[in-house]
Amino acid sequence: MVWCCRPLLRKYGNFIDNLRIYVKGGAGGMGLPRLGGQGGKGGDVKLVAKKEVTLKKIKDKFPHKRFIGGVGGNSSVRALKGQPGEVCQVEVPSGIVITTEHGVKIGELDKEGDEIRVARGGQGGVFQTDFLPSKGQKRIIHLDLKLISDVGLVGFPNAGKSSLLSRISHAKPQVAEYAFTTVKPELGRIMYPDYKQISVADLPGLIEGAHYNRGMGHKFLKHIERTRQLLFVVDVAGFQLSASTLYRSAFETVLLLTLELQLYKQELLDKPALLAVNKMDLPNANEKFEELLKQLENPAGNFHLLPDELVPERPIEFKHIIPVSAATGQGLENLIGCIRKTMDEQADMEIRELAQERLQSLQKETSRTVKRNLKNSPQRTHH
């Protein structure tokens, strides 16, 4: 069954997925030596994940990108213990990875309500410090957003990902006949006749060695982590980044893309995946597509086409392999239908797994309750 879709236009022209900010905890308050009074602690700086917050909104609202905790209150005759400084809470989107200026990971905020302290307030003045307060912690941190979408497009540059996205969703990514057209994530949304919506993300193209952070490297791969399934897009005629790089066939391209995902994070290979073989309007495309299908039926038998170090530990098993042409529209309705089918299957599986987890949890709780009741029940004595 082929699903037709009514595209929904949604623009993300000024989308940003990383932000550099300055954070500083508030200084502590002065102690009171003659009465032994303690100064108040300086306010911390915390990040809190909230819905409908974007990095762009933060940048627009706080152009100086400086966040400072409140100063702790001084000790006084009326209040020997100074008031703590006000905590500076910065609302950020969920799916944020926080790192230091030197790339050291501080933590992640994956869901709404998660929070993390990124700068500690200074201690108030006490006897041990001659009643002198300490300054708050200060540093520059980076906020990196891992984009959430249902489907993430995976491919080398110029495979036609942007053209494909524009045809199935009416998003408006930049499209041209040269590599690295996409330098920022583009989001499109497919709307089906029953009003089901599926979001699709076109992400910057990979190159060999992306897991080492070459090219767009980690800027691309971090977003793949938060997609529910993968849509590989390969050129049926193969791929060559430049005259100085090796030509790769469509099959070799699939293996290399798999390897990049594996080396970045093995779990990415467990995501449901589809394969769109693009540019089927080219000469001899059908013969090349049939050759690719045969190679994918027995991937291990064709590993010799690549050096051992470029062969993934295990090939991805695609749910569907769809020949398409973003230029002519060939196969696009079939692709849209396959995306919907796999998303529905995945949703059904997740519901079953959740129900099974709840059942097991209920059984364990019931078992504990029975044991507790037996233990607490009065023992009968037999005469």
Curated annotation (Swiss-Prot):
Signal peptide: none annotated. One of its GO terms (cellular component) is nucleolus. Coiled coil: none annotated. This is GTP-binding protein 10. It comes from Xenopus tropicalis. GTP binds at residues 155-162, 202-206, 278-281. May be involved in the ribosome maturation process. Keywords: GTP-binding, Nucleotide-binding, Nucleus, Ribosome biogenesis. It is found in: Nucleus, Nucleolus. PANTHER family: DEVELOPMENTALLY REGULATED GTP-BINDING PROTEIN-RELATED (PTHR11702), GTP-BINDING PROTEIN 10 (PTHR11702:SF43). GO terms for molecular function: GTP binding; GTPase activity; magnesium ion binding. Transmembrane segments: none annotated. InterPro entries: G_OBG, GTP-bd, GTP-bd_Obg/CgtA, GTP1_OBG_dom, GTP1_OBG_dom_sf, OBG_GTPase, P-loop_NTPase. One of its GO terms (biological process) is ribosome biogenesis. CDD domains: Obg. Residues 369-383 have a biased composition (Basic residues). Residues 13-148 form the Obg domain. Residues 149-344 form the OBG-type G domain. Pfam families: GTP1_OBG, MMR_HSR1. Belongs to the TRAFAC class OBG-HflX-like GTPase superfamily. OBG GTPase family. Residues 362-383 are annotated as: Disordered. Its main location: nucleus.
